[in-house]
Every structure is written in structure tokens, then in C-alpha cells.
């Protein structure tokens, strides 16, 4: 009852004749809640990211600043999360890696500037040789309330 699939090498498709299986799903192909999602009794707004510079060398650092505002009616705490994506690495890298987070408690209507410092240490990854190193190139950073944020900026690491 096993048929060999064309073009898949040693992969086999199992075809059970006593069951019906549809491969069509009419649901979104995404998690119900993104990583870092949290409930709150109030709402928050996060400004666009402002970088103090658009490039750094291996001994430097970049400061990424956002303003978070409590737009609700209750005092609340928001966890801002910093994700980094290496656009073109020599090995496959995650789409977004959580590198830092900061908790901010705000009263209704209050806003606060939050600064994340990015160093080469946060850009290191394990190479095929088993060594942690960074590579020159372009990086994207995302700052928001969870991993699905579209709030991004980019910078270049020069070596």
C-alpha cells in the first residue's frame, strides 16, 4: 500500500484506503498568538524606531529608541521586545531572534522613551566551524510588543 513519490528520493507517501484525508485547510497558516503576546487591561502605542546611527563597527554600538505611550484608561506594564534579523548570513539564520526586552509601567496618557543598545555581542552566531562570530552586512531590528511587530529599522555592521 505504499507508493513511491516522484522526485522525492526515498520519501514514501502512505495511502490508506480505509480513511479519507483532505489536505485543504480553510484556516490561517499562523500561530493563534505570536511569541511574546500578552494580555493587558490597557492599551499601548509604540513609536517608530529611531537609530542614533545607521552603521557600526565591531567595537561600536547603536542605540535604538522608541517611545511607548499608555493610550488606555488604566495603569499598565508593557514589555517591549528587541528582535534582530541578519539579512544575508553565510548560514541559515532565524527570521527574528529575541535579543533584549524591557518592561515599562505607565499611567494613563503617560509616555516614556525606551532605549536599546545593540552591540556586536548580539550579532554573534555559531558558525559551521563551531566558533561564535559576526559577519559584516545588513541587519534589521524590530521593536514592539511581540514577535509579529512590523516596527523595524536597519543598520550595517562593518568589519
Language-model features: locations:
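Single conserved hydrophobic/aromatic residue that forms the stacking wall/gate
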Residues: 1-12
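Intrinsically disordered, low-complexity Ser/Thr/Gly-rich stretches
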Residues: 10-159
Amino acid at each position: 500500500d505504499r507508493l513511491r513519490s516522484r522526485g522525492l528520493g526515498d520519501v514514501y507517501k502512505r495511502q490508506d484506503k480505509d480513511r479519507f484525508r483532505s489536505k485543504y485547510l480553510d484556516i490561517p497558516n499562523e500561530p493563534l498568538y505570536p511569541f511574546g503576546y500578552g494580555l493587558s487591561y490597557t492599551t499601548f502605542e509604540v513609536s517608530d524606531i529611531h537609530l542614533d546611527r545607521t552603521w557600526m563597527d565591531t567595537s561600536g554600538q547603536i542605540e535604538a529608541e522608541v517611545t511607548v505611550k499608555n493610550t488606555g484608561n488604566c495603569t499598565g506594564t508593557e514589555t517591549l521586545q528587541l528582535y534582530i534579523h541578519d539579512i544575508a548570513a553565510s548560514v541559515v539564520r532565524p527570521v527574528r531572534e529575541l535579543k533584549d526586552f524591557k518592561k515599562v509601567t505607565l499611567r494613563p496618557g503617560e509616555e516614556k522613551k525606551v532605549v536599546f543598545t545593540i552591540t556586536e555581542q548580539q550579532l554573534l552566531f555559531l558558525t559551521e566551524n563551531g566558533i561564535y562570530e559576526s559577519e559584516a552586512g545588513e541587519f534589521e531590528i524590530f521593536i514592539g510588543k511581540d514577535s509579529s511587530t512590523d516596527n523595524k529599522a536597519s543598520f550595517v555592521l562593518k568589519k
